[in-house]
Protein backbone atom coordinates (compact mmCIF):
# COMPACT_ATOMS: atom_id res chain seq x y z
CA UNK A 1 0.00 0.00 0.00
CA UNK A 2 2.89 2.34 0.79
CA UNK A 3 4.41 1.68 -2.64
CA UNK A 4 1.15 2.78 -4.26
CA UNK A 5 0.61 5.91 -2.14
CA UNK A 6 4.20 7.12 -1.72
CA UNK A 7 6.52 5.28 -4.09
CA UNK A 8 10.23 6.13 -3.87
CA UNK A 9 11.39 4.10 -6.88
CA UNK A 10 12.13 7.27 -8.84
CA UNK A 11 14.32 8.63 -6.03
CA UNK A 12 17.99 7.62 -5.90
CA UNK A 13 19.90 8.41 -2.73
CA UNK A 14 23.50 9.54 -2.58
CA UNK A 15 24.44 6.41 -0.64
CA UNK A 16 23.33 4.18 -3.51
CA UNK A 17 25.42 6.19 -5.96
CA UNK A 18 28.45 5.96 -3.66
CA UNK A 19 28.07 2.19 -3.34
CA UNK A 20 27.70 1.66 -7.09
CA UNK A 21 30.72 3.84 -7.91
CA UNK A 22 32.73 2.46 -4.95
CA UNK A 23 33.46 5.93 -3.63
CA UNK A 24 35.77 6.03 -0.61
CA UNK A 25 37.16 2.51 -1.19
CA UNK A 26 40.84 2.52 -0.27
CA UNK A 27 43.25 0.18 -2.06
CA UNK A 28 44.82 -2.69 -0.18
CA UNK A 29 48.17 -2.10 1.55
CA UNK A 30 49.69 -5.03 -0.34
CA UNK A 31 48.35 -7.53 -2.91
CA UNK A 32 47.36 -11.09 -2.11
CA UNK A 33 45.24 -10.33 0.95
CA UNK A 34 42.18 -12.40 1.79
CA UNK A 35 39.08 -10.78 0.27
CA UNK A 36 36.61 -13.59 0.88
CA UNK A 37 34.39 -11.37 3.04
CA UNK A 38 34.39 -8.43 0.62
CA UNK A 39 31.79 -7.62 -2.00
CA UNK A 40 32.13 -8.26 -5.72
CA UNK A 41 33.79 -5.50 -7.73
CA UNK A 42 31.22 -3.93 -10.04
CA UNK A 43 33.85 -2.39 -12.31
CA UNK A 44 35.64 -5.72 -12.81
CA UNK A 45 32.43 -7.26 -14.15
CA UNK A 46 32.40 -4.47 -16.74
CA UNK A 47 36.17 -4.85 -17.41
CA UNK A 48 36.75 -1.30 -16.15
CA UNK A 49 38.64 -1.82 -12.86
CA UNK A 50 42.05 -0.16 -12.93
CA UNK A 51 43.19 -1.09 -9.41
CA UNK A 52 44.20 -4.64 -10.31
CA UNK A 53 45.42 -6.71 -7.39
CA UNK A 54 45.17 -3.74 -5.02
CA UNK A 55 41.39 -3.57 -5.38
CA UNK A 56 39.66 -4.22 -2.02
CA UNK A 57 36.75 -6.00 -3.72
CA UNK A 58 36.63 -9.49 -5.17
CA UNK A 59 37.38 -10.07 -8.85
CA UNK A 60 35.28 -13.03 -9.97
CA UNK A 61 35.77 -14.32 -13.50
CA UNK A 62 33.32 -16.86 -14.92
CA UNK A 63 31.14 -19.27 -12.99
CA UNK A 64 33.04 -21.22 -10.34
CA UNK A 65 31.20 -24.35 -9.31
CA UNK A 66 33.70 -26.05 -6.96
CA UNK A 67 35.04 -24.72 -3.68
CA UNK A 68 38.83 -24.40 -3.49
CA UNK A 69 40.17 -27.04 -1.08
CA UNK A 70 43.32 -24.99 -0.45
CA UNK A 71 41.25 -21.95 0.46
CA UNK A 72 39.43 -24.02 3.09
CA UNK A 73 42.79 -24.55 4.82
CA UNK A 74 43.88 -20.96 4.27
CA UNK A 75 46.68 -22.00 1.90
CA UNK A 76 45.49 -20.71 -1.49
CA UNK A 77 47.99 -18.26 -2.97
CA UNK A 78 46.13 -17.45 -6.20
CA UNK A 79 43.59 -15.10 -4.68
CA UNK A 80 41.21 -13.73 -7.31
CA UNK A 81 43.10 -15.62 -10.03
CA UNK A 82 42.05 -18.98 -8.60
CA UNK A 83 39.77 -20.96 -10.89
CA UNK A 84 37.86 -22.39 -7.90
CA UNK A 85 35.34 -20.77 -5.59
CA UNK A 86 36.55 -18.98 -2.46
CA UNK A 87 33.30 -19.35 -0.57
CA UNK A 88 32.09 -21.92 1.92
CA UNK A 89 29.12 -23.42 0.10
CA UNK A 90 28.20 -26.99 1.02
CA UNK A 91 26.40 -27.57 -2.27
CA UNK A 92 29.54 -26.73 -4.27
CA UNK A 93 32.08 -28.70 -2.25
CA UNK A 94 34.31 -31.27 -4.02
CA UNK A 95 33.38 -34.92 -3.92
CA UNK A 96 34.68 -36.97 -1.01
CA UNK A 97 37.48 -39.25 -2.20
CA UNK A 98 36.93 -41.98 0.40
CA UNK A 99 33.17 -42.16 -0.17
CA UNK A 100 33.58 -42.34 -3.95
CA UNK A 101 36.43 -44.87 -3.72
CA UNK A 102 35.34 -47.19 -0.91
CA UNK A 103 31.64 -46.37 -0.54
CA UNK A 104 31.95 -45.11 3.03
CA UNK A 105 33.56 -42.28 4.99
CA UNK A 106 34.56 -42.55 8.65
CA UNK A 107 34.51 -38.78 9.20
CA UNK A 108 31.15 -37.86 10.71
CA UNK A 109 31.73 -34.15 10.01
CA UNK A 110 33.13 -34.55 6.51
CA UNK A 111 32.78 -31.24 4.65
CA UNK A 112 32.91 -32.88 1.21
CA UNK A 113 30.00 -34.18 -0.85
CA UNK A 114 28.83 -37.77 -0.47
CA UNK A 115 27.30 -38.56 -3.85
CA UNK A 116 25.28 -41.73 -4.23
CA UNK A 117 27.02 -44.06 -6.73
CA UNK A 118 23.64 -45.03 -8.17
CA UNK A 119 23.06 -41.47 -9.31
CA UNK A 120 26.25 -41.58 -11.42
CA UNK A 121 25.07 -44.55 -13.50
CA UNK A 122 23.61 -43.50 -16.84
CA UNK A 123 20.70 -45.14 -18.60
CA UNK A 124 21.60 -47.82 -21.12
CA UNK A 125 20.84 -46.52 -24.64
CA UNK A 126 20.47 -50.07 -25.99
CA UNK A 127 17.97 -51.06 -23.30
CA UNK A 128 15.98 -47.88 -23.90
CA UNK A 129 15.83 -48.85 -27.57
CA UNK A 130 14.51 -52.32 -26.78
CA UNK A 131 17.29 -54.84 -26.17
CA UNK A 132 20.73 -54.94 -24.52
CA UNK A 133 22.99 -57.93 -25.19
CA UNK A 134 24.82 -57.55 -21.87
CA UNK A 135 21.70 -58.22 -19.86
CA UNK A 136 22.02 -57.86 -16.07
CA UNK A 137 25.82 -57.58 -16.40
CA UNK A 138 25.56 -54.23 -18.19
CA UNK A 139 27.36 -51.38 -16.45
CA UNK A 140 24.54 -48.96 -17.33
CA UNK A 141 21.13 -48.71 -15.72
CA UNK A 142 18.25 -50.79 -17.08
CA UNK A 143 15.03 -48.99 -16.17
CA UNK A 144 11.73 -50.60 -17.04
CA UNK A 145 9.27 -48.14 -18.52
CA UNK A 146 5.86 -48.37 -20.16
CA UNK A 147 5.95 -47.41 -23.84
CA UNK A 148 3.54 -44.76 -25.01
CA UNK A 149 1.03 -46.30 -27.42
CA UNK A 150 0.29 -42.96 -29.08
CA UNK A 151 3.98 -42.41 -29.76
CA UNK A 152 4.27 -45.85 -31.39
CA UNK A 153 1.33 -45.05 -33.65
CA UNK A 154 2.98 -41.85 -34.80
CA UNK A 155 2.02 -38.90 -32.59
CA UNK A 156 1.67 -38.18 -28.87
CA UNK A 157 -0.24 -35.01 -27.91
CA UNK A 158 1.48 -34.85 -24.50
CA UNK A 159 4.93 -34.39 -26.03
CA UNK A 160 7.91 -34.34 -23.63
CA UNK A 161 5.58 -34.10 -20.62
CA UNK A 162 4.11 -37.54 -21.31
CA UNK A 163 4.31 -39.93 -18.36
CA UNK A 164 4.99 -42.89 -20.64
CA UNK A 165 8.20 -43.77 -22.44
CA UNK A 166 8.98 -42.39 -25.90
CA UNK A 167 11.61 -44.82 -27.24
CA UNK A 168 14.48 -43.76 -29.46
CA UNK A 169 15.07 -45.85 -32.53
CA UNK A 170 18.50 -44.57 -33.55
CA UNK A 171 21.41 -46.91 -32.91
CA UNK A 172 24.04 -45.69 -30.40
CA UNK A 173 27.35 -46.15 -32.24
CA UNK A 174 30.34 -46.57 -29.94
CA UNK A 175 34.03 -46.96 -30.70
CA UNK A 176 33.89 -50.74 -30.25
CA UNK A 177 30.61 -51.21 -32.11
CA UNK A 178 31.66 -49.59 -35.38
CA UNK A 179 32.25 -51.98 -38.30
CA UNK A 180 35.82 -52.23 -39.57
CA UNK A 181 36.85 -50.18 -42.55
CA UNK A 182 37.23 -51.96 -45.91
CA UNK A 183 40.94 -51.14 -46.02
CA UNK A 184 41.50 -52.93 -42.73
CA UNK A 185 39.78 -56.14 -43.91
CA UNK A 186 42.18 -56.60 -46.83
CA UNK A 187 45.08 -59.00 -46.18
CA UNK A 188 48.51 -57.37 -46.06
CA UNK A 189 49.75 -59.58 -48.91
CA UNK A 190 47.62 -57.72 -51.49
CA UNK A 191 49.07 -54.34 -50.62
CA UNK A 192 52.64 -55.19 -51.71
CA UNK A 193 52.94 -57.79 -54.46
CA UNK A 194 56.69 -57.96 -55.09
CA UNK A 195 58.10 -58.98 -51.66
CA UNK A 196 55.77 -61.99 -51.15
CA UNK A 197 56.54 -63.30 -54.67
CA UNK A 198 60.25 -63.08 -54.11
CA UNK A 199 59.91 -64.74 -50.73
CA UNK A 200 57.79 -67.58 -52.12
CA UNK A 201 60.21 -68.17 -55.00
CA UNK A 202 63.15 -68.39 -52.61
CA UNK A 203 61.25 -70.88 -50.44
CA UNK A 204 60.46 -73.02 -53.49
CA UNK A 205 64.13 -73.09 -54.49
CA UNK A 206 65.23 -74.15 -51.02
CA UNK A 207 62.63 -76.92 -50.81
CA UNK A 208 63.55 -78.22 -54.28
CA UNK A 209 67.23 -78.30 -53.37
CA UNK A 210 66.60 -80.10 -50.08
CA UNK A 211 64.17 -82.61 -51.63
CA UNK A 212 66.93 -84.63 -53.44
CA UNK A 213 68.88 -86.71 -50.86
CA UNK A 214 72.03 -87.11 -53.02
CA UNK A 215 72.34 -83.40 -53.80
CA UNK A 216 74.63 -81.39 -51.58
CA UNK A 217 73.58 -78.20 -49.86
CA UNK A 218 74.28 -74.93 -51.54
CA UNK A 219 77.19 -72.80 -50.29
CA UNK A 220 74.77 -70.06 -49.27
CA UNK A 221 72.89 -72.33 -46.86
CA UNK A 222 76.14 -73.74 -45.49
CA UNK A 223 77.53 -70.25 -44.98
CA UNK A 224 74.41 -69.21 -43.13
CA UNK A 225 74.62 -72.26 -40.86
CA UNK A 226 78.29 -71.64 -40.17
CA UNK A 227 77.60 -68.03 -39.26
CA UNK A 228 74.82 -69.19 -36.94
CA UNK A 229 77.11 -71.72 -35.30
CA UNK A 230 79.86 -69.16 -34.90
CA UNK A 231 77.46 -66.64 -33.38
CA UNK A 232 76.13 -69.33 -31.05
CA UNK A 233 79.67 -70.23 -30.08
CA UNK A 234 80.56 -66.62 -29.30
CA UNK A 235 77.76 -66.39 -26.80
CA UNK A 236 79.43 -68.83 -24.40
CA UNK A 237 82.44 -68.15 -22.11
CA UNK A 238 85.82 -67.64 -23.74
CA UNK A 239 88.49 -70.32 -23.32
CA UNK A 240 91.16 -69.69 -20.68
CA UNK A 241 93.89 -69.50 -23.34
CA UNK A 242 92.38 -66.23 -24.57
CA UNK A 243 91.86 -64.70 -21.10
CA UNK A 244 94.51 -62.22 -19.87
CA UNK A 245 94.79 -61.37 -16.17
CA UNK A 246 95.02 -57.61 -15.67
CA UNK A 247 96.86 -58.05 -12.35
CA UNK A 248 99.88 -60.04 -13.47
CA UNK A 249 99.51 -59.75 -17.24
CA UNK A 250 99.66 -63.53 -17.84
CA UNK A 251 97.17 -65.62 -19.76
CA UNK A 252 95.30 -68.68 -18.58
CA UNK A 253 93.31 -67.37 -15.61
CA UNK A 254 90.99 -64.58 -14.54
CA UNK A 255 91.98 -61.75 -12.21
CA UNK A 256 89.78 -63.03 -9.39
CA UNK A 257 91.70 -66.34 -9.49
CA UNK A 258 95.15 -64.74 -9.57
CA UNK A 259 97.45 -65.96 -6.75
CA UNK A 260 100.20 -63.34 -7.18
CA UNK A 261 98.37 -60.49 -5.44
CA UNK A 262 97.30 -57.04 -6.63
CA UNK A 263 100.93 -55.83 -7.00
CA UNK A 264 101.95 -58.63 -9.33
CA UNK A 265 102.12 -56.29 -12.32
CA UNK A 266 105.22 -54.61 -10.77
CA UNK A 267 107.26 -57.80 -11.05
CA UNK A 268 107.04 -57.74 -14.83
CA UNK A 269 108.65 -54.28 -15.16
From Swiss-Prot:
Component of the cleavage and polyadenylation specificity factor (CPSF) complex that play a key role in pre-mRNA 3'-end formation, recognizing the AAUAAA signal sequence and interacting with poly(A) polymerase and other factors to bring about cleavage and poly(A) addition. CPSF4 binds RNA polymers with a preference for poly(U). Belongs to the CPSF4/YTH1 family. It comes from the Eukaryota. This is Cleavage and polyadenylation specificity factor subunit 4. GO terms for molecular function: RNA binding; sequence-specific double-stranded DNA binding; zinc ion binding. Residues 173-199 are annotated as: Disordered. The gene is CPSF4. It is found in: Nucleus. A zinc finger (CCHC-type) spans 243-260. GO terms for biological process: mRNA processing. A zinc finger (C3H1-type) spans 35-61, 62-89, 90-117, 118-142, 143-169.
Amino acid sequence: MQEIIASVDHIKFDLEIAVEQQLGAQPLPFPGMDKSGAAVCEFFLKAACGKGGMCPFRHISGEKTVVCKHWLRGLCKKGDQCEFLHEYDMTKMPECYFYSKFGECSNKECPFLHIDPESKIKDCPWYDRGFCKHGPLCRHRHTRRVICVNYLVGFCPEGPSCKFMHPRFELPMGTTEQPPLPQQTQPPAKQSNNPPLQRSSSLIQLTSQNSSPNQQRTPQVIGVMQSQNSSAGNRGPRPLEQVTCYKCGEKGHYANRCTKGHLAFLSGQ
